[in-house]
């Protein structure tokens, strides 16, 4: 109001006492509208009927103020959006349950896979076991034949080798021994004859000489005896020695007998062959019989039962999820509605206060306008219709210098806050606020999706668990069948091998015993027994021991063990798919979509649909806000151009400004100075004041001659008034800005300048300019040429 009062006071300064010389056609007792109060300075009383709305009528409509209506529109939009979301959630629930049923069917089919796969796996396993056993028996048959021949070959080789060695060694030795004995016998016989002949002749000569010697000496006479000495006669002993003859045939008779009795081991070899071949032939016979009739029966394998999963039917997780989601949305809806309704109700309070304040402000403005006879009808209407923006424009205009800039600043505020512009802005902001509320709802939905995804993950776990249980049960039964097959083969097939190896070892022992017995019979008690037994142990004993050791190893390791089925043979792939993040590997995923599965996708679709609606509405609302800022920018460009450009004068095609001095229009109230009369009396002429403007001075009539310096205005500092420099309309016609070269201008017809150049400068500078100044004064009966008053400013 202070700005408005200052503005009116500036208009009032354009009038002086001359106004009293041009009274209006009507007096102070002018005709009023119906219901008008006779006091022109007071607002109509409340007990009068008026064609305009009073305070109570205005207050009765505060509940339909723009902000409440805007919030109600937002509430309606949210209700429409939430109803759409509820329908989408219901559709998503139906789709999710349908998808869950599909997943349940898929899960049941997956869990029943062991039932379908086991038949083929059982047949394949049975065929594999059959072929493996037949192949093993064929190999066993060939192996037995090979081992049999190898054992016989080794035994034959050893016996033949040993026989050849014995024959070579013993026969050769015996032949040498017999020949040597015969040669020794012949040599001894010949030697004895020669020795005995030589001994006989030698002993004969010795006997003769000894007897002749003894006869010549008288031994008896020496010892006193008459006995004659004995005579030595060795011929009989020599004859006996000469009669000794060695017979070689008697000496090598035993060797010849031994040579004739050397064994050929044919009996041992034949006995060994018959003993060794017997178990081999028996085993081969059994293997051949089993091989022809063996076929593994696949019916002994278990077949799992079909599985029917009911994790959707028995589990209310999806139902609970959507019920909880609807409850969450309802809570959010209630909170938003309560907040918006409270805001809409509370908006009535400041709007009621605004109506009260506006009503009082309008009363004050009406009184001021009526008291000061303000004549700018459009400005009056604008300030009355838009009190807030007009007052803000007045305050903003004070920051600018010059009348034109101040007017343009006020125009910019009026342009930016016009009803159409604010309507566009309000629609845009309301739309953005609605998008914000819907965005909160969208985030609420997205926040609940992980819970549903977790439930879907549990569904997959149920499927894998059922599949794993079926797989484990089938693997347990199948492995039991395989273990029984292993036991049967090891006992019925490789039992023969164990029997055969034991029999072969026993046969080899018998072979060794028979060989030893034959050698004992042949060489027992002879000097060749130990060498022969050493050679036998070296050539045969060690080899037989090695064969027995190998056969023992074969007996210890001759068993079959078919591989067993793993417990996760049917569930391994499904379990692995749960740990893989790619959609193509997840057996519950739909490869055609990028979402994890159809169940969560049903909820995601709701969020995407709402997100698309929010984006569309946000773009529309943002476009409205942008349109508003475009309007503001257009006004700003217009103001900048107006401030920077030069106004055209009337001579250049421009239009002159409206004047405040409408003396030619008697029905207009002029801004007359009513109580403050300057000069010596109330009817003195106008006094002249120098003013600074446009580099030159301008004079305007203020008061009368003899006006004192700084005359008071109701005891307050002198207000500033406004005067037009456009042509002045008076009773004598219309004049342009007057030119007074010097001296006093005894005229009451508007402002004037010193020379023509000054007038042109003023008109060229700004045709719409209005100069303001405080009261001037006279010095020594004449005005000063410069420096009077304050420099003018533009308003």
From Swiss-Prot:
GO biological process terms held by the UniProt record: plasma membrane fusion involved in cytogamy
Major localisation: membrane
Biased amino acid composition, Basic and acidic residues: 752-762
Keywords: Cell membrane, Conjugation, Glycoprotein, Membrane, Transmembrane, Transmembrane helix
Source superkingdom: Eukaryota
Chain ranges passing through the membrane: 67-87, 150-170, 331-351, 422-442, 617-637
Region described as Disordered: 11-37, 736-795
Compositionally skewed regions (Polar residues) per UniProt: 13-24
Annotated compartments: Cell membrane
Statement: the UniProt record of this protein carries the keyword Cell membrane: yes
InterPro entries assigned to the protein according to its UniProt record, in alphabetical order: PRM1 (IPR026777)
Topology versus the membrane: Multi-pass membrane protein
Glycosylation sites: 189, 259, 270, 288, 469, 483, 498, 505, 520, 580
Residues exposed to the Cytoplasmic side: 88-149, 352-421, 638-795
Family annotation (PANTHER family): PLASMA MEMBRANE FUSION PROTEIN PRM1
Family of the protein in this entry: Belongs to the PRM1 family.
Summary of the function given for this chain in its UniProt record: Involved in cell fusion during mating by stabilizing the plasma membrane fusion event.
Name used for this protein in its record: Plasma membrane fusion protein prm1
Organism annotation: Sclerotinia sclerotiorum (strain ATCC 18683 / 1980 / Ss-1)
Species classification: Eukaryota, Fungi, Dikarya, Ascomycota, Pezizomycotina
């Amino acid at each position: 109001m202070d700005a408005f009062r200052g503005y009116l006071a500036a208009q009032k300064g354009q009038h002086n006492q001359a106004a009293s010389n041009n009274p209006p056609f009507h007096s102070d007792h002018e005709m009023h509208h119906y219901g008008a109060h006779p006091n022109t300075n007071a607002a109509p009383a409340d007990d009068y009927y008026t064609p305009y709305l009073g305070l109570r009528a205005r207050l009765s409509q505060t509940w339909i103020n723009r902000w409440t209506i805007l919030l109600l529109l937002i509430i309606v939009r949210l209700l429409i959006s939430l109803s759409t979301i509820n329908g989408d959630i219901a559709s998503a629930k139906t789709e999710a349950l349908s998808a869950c049923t599909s997943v349940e069917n898929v899960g049941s089919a997956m869990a029943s896979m062991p039932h379908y796969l086991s038949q083929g796996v059982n047949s394949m396993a049975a065929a594999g076991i059959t072929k493996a056993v037949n192949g093993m028996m064929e190999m066993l048959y060939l192996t037995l034949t090979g081992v049999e021949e190898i054992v016989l070959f080794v035994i034959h080789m050893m016996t033949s080798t040993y026989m050849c060695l014995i024959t070579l060694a013993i026969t050769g030795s015996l032949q040498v021994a017999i020949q040597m004995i015969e040669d020794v016998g012949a040599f001894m016989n010949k030697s004895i004859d020669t020795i005995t002949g030589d001994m006989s002749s030698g002993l004969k000569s010795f006997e003769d000489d000894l007897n002749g010697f003894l006869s010549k000496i008288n031994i008896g006479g020496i010892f006193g005896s008459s006995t004659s000495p004995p005579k030595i006669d060795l011929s009989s002993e020599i004859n006996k020695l000469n009669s000794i003859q060695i017979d070689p045939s008697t000496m090598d008779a035993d060797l010849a007998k031994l040579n004739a009795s050397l064994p050929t081991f044919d009996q041992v070899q034949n006995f060994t062959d018959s003993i060794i071949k017997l178990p081999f032939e028996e085993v081969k016979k059994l293997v051949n019989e089993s091989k022809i009739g063996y076929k593994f029966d696949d019916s002994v394998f278990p077949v799992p039962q079909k599985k029917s999963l009911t994790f959707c039917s028995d589990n209310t997780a999806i139902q609970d999820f959507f019920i909880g989601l609807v409850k969450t949305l309802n809570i959010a809806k209630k909170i938003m509605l309560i907040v918006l309704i409270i805001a809409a109700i509370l908006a009535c309070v400041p709007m009621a206060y605004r109506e009260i304040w506006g009503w009082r402000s309008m009363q004050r403005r009406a009184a001021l306008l009526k008291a000061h006879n303000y004549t700018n009808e459009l400005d009056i209407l604008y300030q009355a219709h838009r009190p807030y923006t007009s007052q803000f424009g007045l305050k903003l205009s004070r920051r600018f210098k010059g009348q034109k800039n101040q007017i343009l600043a006020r125009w910019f505020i009026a342009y930016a806050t016009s009803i159409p512009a604010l309507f566009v802005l309000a629609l845009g902001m309301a739309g953005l606020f609605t998008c914000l509320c819907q965005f909160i709802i969208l985030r609420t939905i997205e926040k609940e999706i992980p819970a549903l995804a977790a439930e879907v993950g549990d569904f997959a776990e149920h499927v894998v668990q059922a599949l794993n249980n079926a797989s484990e049960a089938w693997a347990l039964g199948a492995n039991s069948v395989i273990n029984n097959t292993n036991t049967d083969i090891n006992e019925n097939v490789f039992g023969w091998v164990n029997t055969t190896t034991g029999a072969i070892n026993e046969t080899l022992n018998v072979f060794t015993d028979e060989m030893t017995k034959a050698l004992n019979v042949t060489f027992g008690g002879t000097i060749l027994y130990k060498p022969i037994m050493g050679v036998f142990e070296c050539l045969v004993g060690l080899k037989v021991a090695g064969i027995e050791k190998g056969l023992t190893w074969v007996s210890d390791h001759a068993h079959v063990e078919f591989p067993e089925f793993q417990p996760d043979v049917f569930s391994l792939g499904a379990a692995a798919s749960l740990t893989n993040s790619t959609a193509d590997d997840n057996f519950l995923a739909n490869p055609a979509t990028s979402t994890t599965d159809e169940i969560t996708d049903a909820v995601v679709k709701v969020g995407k649909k709402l997100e698309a609606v929010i984006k569309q509405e946000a773009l529309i609302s943002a476009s409205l806000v942008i349109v508003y800022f475009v309007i503001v920018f257009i006004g700003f460009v217009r103001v900048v151009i107006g401030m920077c450009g030069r106004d055209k004068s009337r001579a250049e095609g421009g239009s002159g400004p409206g004047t405040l001095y409408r003396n030619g229009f008697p029905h207009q109230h002029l801004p007359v100075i009513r109580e403050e009369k300057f000069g010596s009396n109330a009817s003195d002429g106008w006094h002249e004041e120098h003013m600074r403007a446009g580099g030159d001075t301008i004079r305007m009539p203020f008061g009368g001659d003899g006006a004192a310096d700084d005359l008071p205005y109701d005891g307050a500092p002198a207000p500033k008034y406004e005067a037009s420099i456009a042509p002045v309309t008076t009773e004598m016609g219309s004049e342009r800005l007057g030119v007074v070269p010097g001296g006093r201008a005894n005229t009451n017809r508007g402002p004037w300048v010193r020379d023509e150049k000054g007038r042109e400068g003023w008109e060229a500078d700004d045709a719409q300019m209005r100069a303001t100044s405080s009261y001037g004064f006279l010095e020594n009966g004449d005005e000063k040429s410069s420096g009077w008053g304050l420099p003018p400013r533009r308003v």
